[in-house]
Regions:
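A conserved acidic beta->alpha catalytic loop
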Residues: 69, 84-92, 107
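A short, conserved alpha-helix in the catalytic core of glycosyltransferases
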Residues: 202-253
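Short, acidic, metal-binding catalytic loop of nucleotide-sugar glycosyltransferases
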Residues: 68-77
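Short, flexible, basic/aromatic active-site loop/helix in glycosyltransferases
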Residues: 178-201
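Glycine-rich, basic loop-to-helix element that forms the pyrophosphate-binding segment
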Residues: 105-122, 132, 143
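Short aromatic/hydrophobic "clamp" motif used to bind/position activated sugar donors
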Residues: 127
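Active-site-adjacent helix/loop segment of glycosyltransferases
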Residues: 246-285
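Conserved donor NDP-sugar-binding/catalytic core segment of glycosyltransferases
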Residues: 134-178
């Protein structure tokens, strides 16, 4: 089966930012390695580098392992903001009980609607969009910050997303777009050992990606006509048109359950219809 390799994967010059560097100094990339992210920021009055925006819709069962993994991050230079999409499973009560910063929406606005609210509420230079059904590796936040700070022309960084229950398999290594017009997840279902090289990609998978926040003011936010799928391909494409890069960083790893944030009830708009929306905006050179 073809790997659909193309020029994006062959020309990356950001490898120094997301390779397997020995003796990596996280202080240079994050600035704060002690204490809980939100609490430490409030104590010092120092603005954090990144806000982790977590969209949630009836995902209470995923909350505890996700937040436990975030609490164990080596890099602490982040705030957390949950955007709840009108959950009815006890998520609202749990978030309030845990005193986790959150915005509570009255109804389900879809993935794009929720993350747009979070992006506009964030005051940090970078924003990580993170599905609730993920468990980030200890080094995840630090590696993502280091990667995006390698160049002001990097709009987004996609992590190495691995299947939680089959860790030998990839879930996503960035999104690609073939010459035949098909969008696809790079690496899905393949050996996770084969995706250890940094490269350019067409767009980052928004389930666990970091973005340069100010660029959204230039290119626009996630298109809310994409209720749950292909919204990341669309925004990544707009960034490329504006002259920015999207890259894959293999040293930033996240373990993903799958369909936690979205799922069939959360996705009334078929992916094929979403693809038509992307193509309707396409510019061919």
């Amino acid at each position: 089966m073809s790997d659909h390799r193309n020029d994006y994967e062959a020309e990356c010059d950001y490898k120094a930012g997301c390779g397997n560097e020995a003796g990596c100094d996280y202080k240079a990339g994050c600035g704060n390695e002690a204490g809980r992210g939100n609490e430490t920021g409030r104590r010092t009055g120092r603005r954090r580098k990144v806000t982790i925006v977590i969209p949630n819709y009836n995902g209470l069962k995923f909350m505890e392992p996700c937040f436990k993994a975030l609490s164990m991050q080596i890099c602490r230079d982040f705030d957390i903001l949950v955007v709840d999409n009108g959950s009815t499973d006890g998520s609202v009560e749990w978030l309030k009980e845990q005193e986790i910063p959150a915005i509570f929406l009255p109804e389900n606005t879809g993935f794009s609607g929720a993350v747009n609210v979070g992006l506009k509420a964030a005051a940090t230079p970078y924003v990580i969009l993170l599905n609730n059904d993920t468990e980030p590796d200890f080094h995840y936040v630090g590696e993502m910050i280091k990667a995006i700070e390698r160049s002001p022309k990097i709009f987004s960084v996609s992590c190495k997303m691995i299947q939680l229950f089959r860790k030998e398999l990839m879930d996503d290594a960035g999104d690609m777009y073939s010459l035949l017009g098909w969008a696809y997840q790079r690496g899905v279902g393949r050996s996770s050992a084969k995706y250890n090289r940094a490269c350019r990609i067409f767009s980052a998978c928004a389930g666990a990606a970091i973005y340069r926040r100010e660029v959204f003011d230039e290119i626009g936010y996630f298109d809310e006509m994409h209720f749950a799928y292909l919204e990341d391909l669309d925004v990544g494409y707009r960034a490329r048109i504006a002259g920015y890069d999207n890259i894959y960083c293999p040293t930033a790893m996240v373990y993903h359950v799958g369909s936690g944030t979205s799922g069939s009830k959360y996705n009334p708009l078929p992916a094929a219809s979403s693809m038509k929306l992307v193509l309707s905006k396409a510019k061919f050179f």
